[in-house]
Regions:
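Residues lining hydrophobic/aromatic ligand-binding pockets adjacent to catalytic sites
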Residues: 1-167
Length: 167
């Protein structure tokens, strides 16, 4: 008989904005056995101060720190959903980096078209035992990013505690 896969005790989230690489890695290092789960559609970040967060550089830095990485594109918002959020940001007069919350239309669309169609149980089962998955995206504030929706679903459906790592 095969032992059942254990479920992580918690999930963490982290954005890229407002971190530098050293502080980002230090924050991850405070977690027990972190595994970065990149949920970005486009794994590049604009601005020279965030060059470290572009996919290949980030993967090299994580590997050097002994932190596993995986990209789960199916949890990323579609281009259409991202455009919907950008339009809401423009209408509210807020920039992407200063956004505090997600637009209700974006929320509904992300939940219906992405989150409800994704098997989070399968994601959890694919992770090694005793790890802390760390959902990675761009926004500094978790409430301004879809990663908080994923973390919330993991909490409500799988009993994981949620830790938001913020700069």
């Amino acid at each position: 008989m095969v032992a059942p896969q254990s479920v992580p005790a918690r999930v963490a989230t982290i954005g890229v904005h407002d971190w530098d690489l050293d502080c980002f890695l230090a924050a991850l290092g405070e977690l027990e056995h972190p595994v970065v789960v990149d949920v970005r559609q486009r794994r590049g970040v604009r601005g020279p101060q965030y060059a470290w967060a572009n996919s290949q550089r980030l993967q090299r830095a994580l590997a050097a720190a002994g932190i596993p990485y995986r990209h789960v594109r199916n949890l990323a918002p579609t281009t259409e959903l991202r455009q919907l959020q950008y339009a809401a940001d423009d209408a509210a007069g807020v920039g992407k980096r200063s956004r505090q919350t997600l637009d209700p239309g974006y929320l509904a669309g992300y939940i219906e078209h992405i989150l409800d169609r994704f098997d989070l149980s399968e994601l959890l089962a694919s992770l090694p035992d005793d790890v802390t998955p760390v959902l990675l995206c761009v926004e500094a504030q978790p409430g301004a990013c879809h990663r908080s929706l994923i973390a919330g679903r993991l909490a409500s459906e799988h009993g994981l505690d949620v830790v938001h790592l913020c700069p």
